[in-house]
Amino acid sequence: MINLSINKKVIIFGFIFTFFSSFGQSFFLGLFNAPIRNELGITHGQFGNIYATATIFSSLLLIWVGKKIDEYQIIYYASFVIVLLFLSSLFFSFINNIYLLSVGIFLMRFSGQGLMSHTSTTTVSRFFEKSRGKALSTIWFGLSSAEFILPILITYLFVIYSWRT
């Protein structure tokens, strides 16, 4: 018999993690492109090169850190990922040169797009045997929701606050 209460919790966990993976997704970080370029005085090409390099390095590190999910209980691994995303977001708000921008984008891509989505997908895939496809499609609605909500919210907040806030 399937415990629906636990199933719901796992789906909610996956949904939340895929939603917050958006902090490292291109659609989200792209919202900060113009204010960062203007403040740092860099071109589209320079920003693109930094972004591409940071993405490649974050994907390489994900190969090593991602497999650690098999060595730790999910509560500890997920807590690590949450703290890392929080610290990455905090670090991102202090960017004031291209070197910090490189590290900031790397951290956001690694913790958000990389580890948050990896953690949600791996956890849900492990838990669901029969309805794995349904469960995964449900949790990935979290990213679709973020793609709808966050650009509107961030654009509105840019009117009131600096991009660093």
Short names for language-model regions:
Residues 70-82:
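Cytoplasmic membrane-interface "Motif A"-like loop-to-helix N-cap segments
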Residues 61-73:
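Helix-to-loop junctions at the C-terminal end of transmembrane segments
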Residues 143-165:
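Helix-loop-helix hairpin linking two adjacent transmembrane segments in secondary transporters
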Residues 114-128:
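Intracellular juxtamembrane helix-capping segments at the cytosolic ends
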Residues 27, 55-63, 147-148:
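Residue-level signature of mid-helix packing/kink "hotspots" within the transmembrane helices
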Residues 19, 99-115:
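Hydrophobic core of transmembrane alpha-helices in multi-pass small-molecule transporters
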Residues 83-96:
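C-terminal ends and interior cores of transmembrane alpha-helices
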Residues 6-28, 106:
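Pair of pore-lining "gating" transmembrane helices in MFS-fold secondary transporters
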